[in-house]
Regions:
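Secretory targeting and sorting signals
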Residues: 1-23
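A structural motif
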Residues: 22-151
Length: 151
């Protein structure tokens, strides 16, 4: 079975876990900062579920976080989990939040994979029911692969 199919099957079987969230060192905000690598920070989703990124508002799963990534070589980007557990992202001039390919479902955004010199990068999400992490990679010049694999 292809990795993407396994991912879809696992995520489809996962049940929402509003009270659960991906493990974090600091429940309010976590930051990773380094001059030569990808930096990112998290913003807790408020009770209203609404958060902006680059001027675009989205509605996200309560108890989750929206991650803002400062990619080294490409446009900055935001990632969040919608109320239906789908994975969304936005970037400057994107025109709004866009659903990521691959039919992935998750309970929280976990972290960003460092961006390579060629622009390759990734985003990792967490699924509460299996306590597993899944990654989708960005492969220039094609873009996001649309395939979720175990991280």
């Amino acid at each position: 079975m292809a990795a993407g199919m396994v991912f879809a099957a696992v995520f489809a079987a996962a049940t929402p876990a509003a009270a659960n969230a991906a493990p974090r060192a600091d429940s309010a905000v976590q930051e990773t900062v380094a001059a030569t690598s990808t930096a990112y920070h998290f913003t807790a989703v408020p009770a209203s579920g609404r958060l902006p990124c680059f001027g675009y508002y989205g509605t996200f799963k309560q108890g989750s976080y929206v991650m803002v990534v400062d990619w080294v070589h490409t446009s900055d980007e935001c990632f969040g989990i919608s109320t239906d557990r789908t994975i969304w992202h936005a970037w400057p001039n994107s025109g709004g939040w866009k659903k990521m390919g691959g039919n992935g479902l998750a309970d929280d955004i976990a972290y960003a994979v460092d961006e390579g010199a060629n622009g390759s990068k990734g985003v990792v999400v967490w699924v509460a029911s299996s306590n597993k992490y899944w990654v989708q990679r960005y492969a220039p010049p094609l873009g996001w692969t649309g395939e979720w694999t175990l991280a």
